[in-house]
Amino acid sequence: THRVSSMGAVPGLSRSELDNHADTCVLGCNALITHDYERPVLVSGFHAADRPKTLRTVGGVVGYQDPSSGQAIYLAINQAIYAPENEHNLLGVFQLRMNDVRVNDLPKFMSADPTDQTHAITISLDNDGSELTIPLSLEGVISYFPTFKPSIRDNESSEEGIHLFHLTYASPDWDPLCPDFANSEENMIKPNGHVVPRNW
């Protein structure tokens, strides 16, 4: 059973929010669905009164306007749960990080030395060190960035690595309950609680 936060629709708004409690990304009605993995999942919320329900596992794309260039960027979110009643999308931070996407959720005003990569999502574009940085905003304590539903034509004409980037991987199968995550973390901690150096 997957766990996601409950989220109501807010007319006229579309955005993608970071959700540290969601073990899998969730796409709402303002994402363009491009693939059905035919792998339904049982989803539960945080309230005991919420009945678990079966939802589809899909791949989808959201659009984002890069404020530094004004260009439209398309972000593929693979192996996500489709919840069409939701206006916004939820981004499971762990799932993004497993695709080597850097997520910094510390607000800039809380950082001792903020940079462009503070409170931002950063995607490495190639081996020359160039990056796409998506700055995050706050509503209350929720980190988010504005997104929109792209047209089929815009998605099909976008060139991967130039206008299209993947926030999560399409394969292997995403399993948020995989014990390897806990084992890998345990192997990085000494019995005294200190971190194990990488070259130890």
Question: Where in this protein do the model-derived segments appear?
Answer:
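Aspartic protease core domain of the pepsin/retropepsin superfamily
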Residues: 25, 35-40, 52-200
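Aspartyl protease active-site motif detector
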Residues: 2-47, 78-92
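Accessible peptide chain termini
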Residues: 1-2, 200
